[in-house]
């Protein structure tokens, strides 16, 4: 069984999280610059068995032509071309940034660390992945 990686795609930064090999626990991985994402993923997939990607997608937005929706759609196409052996899922990312910010407060992070957008991005990816795992297991297993 391979890992599942979640991607919280942003125009500037991309938060990444990954499961353990048994696909039980979602953990924050890192945050990379948006233009470095493909290179990072190619390197990571070469050393780790990644079975699937879960891309956070704002599912309840009426205007599908916003810059972020267009960028996420293009990124998904890029993933499909570069990783034909991995499944690619879209998963609702609504409110993940707010949940991540609240988790940092509850976790006792200092104000400086809570303002660090890299922490928010990788934690948002982890929330997306945990939500996907819960939903996936409920519907497909």
UniProtKB/Swiss-Prot annotation:
Location, primary (coarse class) = cytoplasm
Sequence intervals crossing the membrane: none
Q: Which GO terms describe its biological process?
A: rRNA 5'-end processing
UniProt keyword annotation of Hydrolase present:
yes
Q: Which InterPro entries match?
A: RNaseH-like_sf, YqgF, YqgF/RNaseH-like_dom, YqgF/RNaseH-like_dom_sf
Protein family according to the UniProt entry: Belongs to the YqgF nuclease family.
Q: Which CDD domains match?
A: YqgF
Record GO terms (molecular function): nuclease activity
Query: What is the designated name of this protein?
Result: Putative pre-16S rRNA nuclease
| Cystine pairings recorded for this chain | none
Q: Where in the cell does this protein reside?
A: Cytoplasm
What Enzyme Commission number(s) does the record list for this chain?
3.1.-.-
What is known about what this protein does?
Could be a nuclease involved in processing of the 5'-end of pre-16S rRNA.
For the protein in the UniProt heading, the enzyme class is hydrolase
* NCBIfam families registered for this protein in UniProt: RNAse_H_YqgF
**Gene3D superfamilies documented for this protein:** YqgF/RNase H-like domain (3.30.420.140)
Signal as UniProt keyword = no
């Amino acid at each position: 069984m391979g890992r599942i990686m979640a991607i919280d795609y942003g125009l500037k930064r991309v938060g990444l999280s990954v499961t353990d090999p048994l696909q039980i626990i979602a953990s924050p991985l890192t945050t990379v610059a948006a233009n470095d994402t493909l290179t990072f993923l190619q390197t990571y997939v070469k050393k780790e068995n990644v079975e699937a990607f879960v891309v956070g997608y704002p599912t309840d937005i009426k205007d599908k032509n916003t810059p972020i929706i267009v960028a996420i759609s293009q990124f998904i196409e890029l993933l499909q071309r570069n990783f034909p052996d991995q499944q690619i899922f879209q998963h609702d990312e609504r409110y993940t940034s707010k949940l991540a910010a609240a988790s940092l407060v509850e976790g006792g992070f200092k104000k400086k660390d809570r303002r660090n957008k890299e922490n928010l991005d990788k934690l948002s990816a982890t929330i997306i992945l945990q939500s996907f795992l819960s939903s996936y297991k409920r519907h497909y297993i």
